[in-house]
Design a protein with these regions (language model features):
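Acidic, low-complexity, intrinsically disordered interaction modules
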Residues: 22-87
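Short terminal alpha-helical segments
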Residues: 5-25
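Generic short amphipathic/hydrophobic targeting helices enriched at N-termini
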Residues: 5, 9-12, 49, 85-88
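Generic extreme N-terminus detector
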Residues: 4-5, 56
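Short Lys/Arg-rich cationic patches that frequently serve as NLS/NoLS or arginine-rich RNA/DNA-binding motifs
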Residues: 2-4, 36
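Short acidic DE-rich linear segments
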Residues: 93-95
Length: 95
């Protein structure tokens, strides 16, 4: 699937949710088990996901992906995800 700024944001969320755990497990042993190590691991996973999504880099897009990676099983995230129904990536990132 080709992803553009007009792509439904829930499709991108699904892509991130499906691939982040696998990337996390693959890279886990390459980073120390400290706050700094986990932060560096998160950044690496976000970079890999941004390459997979293949959109031009922006701080907003990276922050959006990082939020999905860091908080996938929280009530707040579930409510946020529900609020994105029907929106495009462009709507979310540039609002």
């Amino acid at each position: 699937m080709k992803i553009t700024y007009k792509t439904n944001v829930l499709d991108v969320i699904r892509l991130v949710e499906n691939n982040a755990p696998e990337l996390w497990k693959k890279e886990w042993n390459n980073f120390p088990n400290t706050w700094g190590g986990v932060n560096a691991l998160t950044k690496k996973v976000v970079k890999d996901l941004l390459v997979m999504i293949n959109l031009p880099y922006s701080k907003e897009l990276a922050g959006f992906i990082r939020y999905i990676v860091e908080y996938p099983n929280t009530i707040r995230y579930s409510e946020y995800k529900r609020s994105l129904i029907g929106k495009t990536i462009e709507d979310v990132i540039f609002d």
